[in-house]
């Protein structure tokens, strides 16, 4: 990851996205991912109608190909997709367990230098949840994190070095524009 910030030309020859992640999903995270199809259905019929930042076609492809072996960034995205439509806490003075789990996994990915378009999308959904539930100053900090992730991924300028690699298809391009 440091190579990107020190010399983006060296970085562009290194395929970071295919490197294995050392992050192992906890049993708690896996328990929340029990029904991926239901999570996707609820998200795309609710939140996606007013905030279309995730490609349904791409997400279906990623989740279908990862049966039994979900990547951590996709797991975080699915947690946050579940959080926004279902995110009402039983006790409004205490954050939901799902929110705390998503927030913890987000911090784990950041500590392990795992920055992808999926993790940015998850953070955007996390920010929506925090703003909607008036969780301040966490909401402001998450929005700032989203901005920094977008800049690091090169989404702010098409001529900027692209941490996420080159765009391979129209779906990639469209999703980056919406992210």
From Swiss-Prot:
What InterPro entries does the database record attribute to this sequence?
A: Transcription_factor_dom_fun
Please tell me whether the keyword Ubl conjugation is annotated for this protein: no
Q: Name one GO cellular component term.
A: nucleus
Q: Which Pfam families match?
A: Fungal_trans
What subcellular locations does the record give?
Nucleus
BP-aspect Gene Ontology terms: DNA-templated transcription
Keyword list, A-Z: Nucleus, Transcription, Transcription regulation, Virulence
User: What is the predominant subcellular site recorded for this chain?
Assistant: nucleus
Entry keyword Transcription: yes
A GO MF annotation of the entry reads:
zinc ion binding
Q: What does this protein do?
A: Transcription factor that probably coregulates the gene clusters that mediates the biosynthesis of botcinin acid and its botcinin derivatives, acetate-derived polyketides that contribute to virulence when combined with the sesquiterpene botrydial. Botcinin acid and its derivatives have been shown to induce chlorosis and necrosis during host plant infection, but also have antifungal activities.
Designated name of the protein: Transcription factor BOA15
């Amino acid at each position: 990851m440091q190579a990107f910030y020190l010399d983006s030309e060296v970085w562009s020859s290194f395929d970071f996205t295919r490197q294995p992640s050392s992050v192992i999903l906890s049993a708690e995270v896996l328990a929340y991912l029990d029904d991926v199809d239901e999570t996707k259905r609820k998200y795309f019929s609710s939140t996606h109608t007013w905030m279309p930042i995730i490609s349904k076609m791409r997400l279906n492809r990623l989740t279908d190909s990862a049966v039994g072996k979900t990547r951590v960034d996709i797991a975080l995205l699915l947690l946050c997709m579940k959080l926004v439509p279902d995110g009402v806490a039983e006790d409004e003075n205490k954050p939901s367990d799902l929110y705390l789990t998503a927030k913890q996994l987000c911090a784990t990915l950041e500590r392990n230098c795992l920055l992808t378009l999926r993790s940015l999308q998850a953070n955007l959904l996390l920010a929506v949840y925090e703003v909607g539930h008036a969780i301040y100053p966490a909401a402001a900090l998450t929005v700032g994190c989203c901005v920094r992730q977008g800049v690091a991924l090169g989404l702010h300028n098409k001529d900027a070095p692209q941490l996420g690699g080159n765009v391979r298809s129209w779906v990639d391009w469209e999703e980056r524009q919406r992210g």
